[in-house]
UniProtKB/Swiss-Prot annotation:
Organism per entry: Danio rerio
Catalysis performed (reactions): (3S)-3-hydroxy-3-methylglutaryl-CoA = acetoacetate + acetyl-CoA
Protein name, per record: 3-hydroxy-3-methylglutaryl-CoA lyase, cytoplasmic
Residues that coordinate or bind substrate: R51
UniProt subcellular location: Cytoplasm, Cytosol; Endoplasmic reticulum membrane
Amino acid sequence: MGNVSSAVKHCLSYETFLRDYPWLPRLLWEEKCSELPKLPVYVKIVEVGPRDGLQNEKEIVPTEVKIQLIDLLSQTGLPVIEATSFVSSKWVAQMADHTAVLKGIKRSPDVRYPVLTPNIQGFQAAVAAGANEVAVFGSASETFSRKNINCSIEESLQRFEQVVSAAKQEGIPVRGYVSCALGCPYEGQVKPSQVTKVAKRLFELGCYEVSLGDTIGVGTAGSMAEMLSDVLTEVPAGALAVHCHDTYGQALPNILIALQMGVSVVDASVAGLGGCPFAKGASGNVSTEDLLYMLHGLGIETGVDLLKVMEAGDFICKALNRKTNSKVSQATRNN
């Protein structure tokens, strides 16, 4: 995992240990070699609000609002902002303005702006619009795959192979997603081995990073650990990310488990925007604000300014005429 920070180190005085970690047994402090699971020094946050966060909105969000949101997020220190999706407007009408959005944003040289491209037609349209990074979206659930992208898992992987091959010729990096990694709205529980199978294929195809998504937010720390343990037998931690929805309020615990297991890339959405148009009942992604609060509280570097992210969250919530889903923003604004 490279350089790491530790939640508890044996060099702490017992008084400090007792003050900061009163729930831990004295034995842990006494055993010099003992320490809690290690955490990354730095976590890369992939902001998915402009795409995954807005795609489920019932009312069409004006193009200029989407552009302004991305421009605000570009000033926060976020290294990656997923801008839009080059899917058919028949499937996701909210993303029909993808070309205008991608051409309208003020790109920062320090930020990458990937776009979702489900097939070769979407990839070609994205490149024509100026995309310099793309993402493909697969599923660990056969039923979800057919309902979401209208094909089987195997057929989707064949489509992605075309995209990755074309991207290599253009020198464009490709990120992969595996949805339903911890549960499916149609099939229920998903076997970890099935997640591993799809993640491995995406990695072998050439995806530099594979994001494992708890699409409907049913995962627990236990199921996250079980799933990751299996995936890590085939895909290195350095090539993995986690993407957690907060339907049951378990997103942050699940992310913490992933960090302890070596993952250092986390997807999040400003103001906790999101859901899934093909997964009824799924709530938004973990909010970027809440994730930052947890990471900074653990002493983990992100390079992201929490206050500026909150300002971007205020903007989009006002534009959508709704309250933020971020607990941090709620608490701060109420004080």
